[in-house]
């Protein structure tokens, strides 16, 4: 069994964002400012609640982040959709990390619950993605549950996050 890298620095994540980590035409992360985490602290193809693998990542929050001045003026809060997008980003990264081919695209999610907010006073956001299944057929599909914590308190939960890897048709 090949041992895969189990954590990634910001610089390594940017390599993935440039499409240089998993090869041309394969999974890549968005670049800043849409990249919603600074490091992957742990990734494994086993373990987690379903023993199908997991990802853990962190995002350093500073008051000067791009979304605070515009969402909302005088009442800054990180848009909830950005936290959800981070979960999809990490789900797609996992599929590429497994060595699966294709470009990653978010497909859907089951239920999303927001019970708190990220404000300029928040210091650290943590993400957890716990895989339930990876299907390998005409397309590769990852299905996972996710959570997001702000300074240690769980504030977002998402079930049945789905990301597919799509390969371009020849011709």
UniProtKB/Swiss-Prot annotation:
Function as written in the Swiss-Prot or TrEMBL entry: Necessary for the introduction of cis unsaturation into fatty acids. Catalyzes the dehydration of (3R)-3-hydroxydecanoyl-ACP to E-(2)-decenoyl-ACP and then its isomerization to Z-(3)-decenoyl-ACP. Can catalyze the dehydratase reaction for beta-hydroxyacyl-ACPs with saturated chain lengths up to 16:0, being most active on intermediate chain length.
Reactions catalysed according to its record: a (3R)-hydroxyacyl-[ACP] = a (2E)-enoyl-[ACP] + H2O; (3R)-hydroxydecanoyl-[ACP] = (2E)-decenoyl-[ACP] + H2O; (2E)-decenoyl-[ACP] = (3Z)-decenoyl-[ACP]
Encoding gene per record: fabA
Oligomeric and partner information: Homodimer.
InterPro entries: FabA, FabA_FabZ, HotDog_dom_sf
A GO MF term: (3R)-hydroxyacyl-[acyl-carrier-protein] dehydratase activity
Active site: 71
Primary residence: cytoplasm
Name the UniProt record assigns to this protein: 3-hydroxydecanoyl-[acyl-carrier-protein] dehydratase
């Amino acid at each position: 069994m090949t041992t895969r890298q189990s954590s990634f620095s910001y610089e390594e994540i940017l390599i993935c964002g440039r499409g240089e980590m998993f090869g041309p035409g394969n999974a890549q992360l968005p670049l800043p400012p849409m990249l919603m985490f600074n490091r992957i602290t742990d990734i494994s193809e086993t373990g987690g609640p379903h023993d199908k693998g997991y990802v853990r990542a962190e995002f350093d929050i500073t008051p000067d982040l791009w979304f605070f001045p515009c969402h909302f003026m005088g009442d800054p809060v990180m848009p909830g959709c950005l936290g959800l997008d981070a979960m999809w980003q990490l789900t797609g990264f996992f599929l590429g990390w497994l060595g699966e081919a294709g470009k990653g695209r978010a497909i859907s999610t089951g239920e999303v619950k927001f019970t708190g907010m990220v404000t300029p006073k928040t210091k650290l956001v943590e993400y957890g993605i716990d895989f339930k299944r990876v299907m390998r057929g005409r397309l590769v599909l990852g299905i996972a549950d996710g959570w997001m914590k702000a300074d240690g308190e769980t504030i977002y939960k998402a079930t049945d996050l789905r990301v597919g890897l799509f390969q371009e048709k020849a011709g």
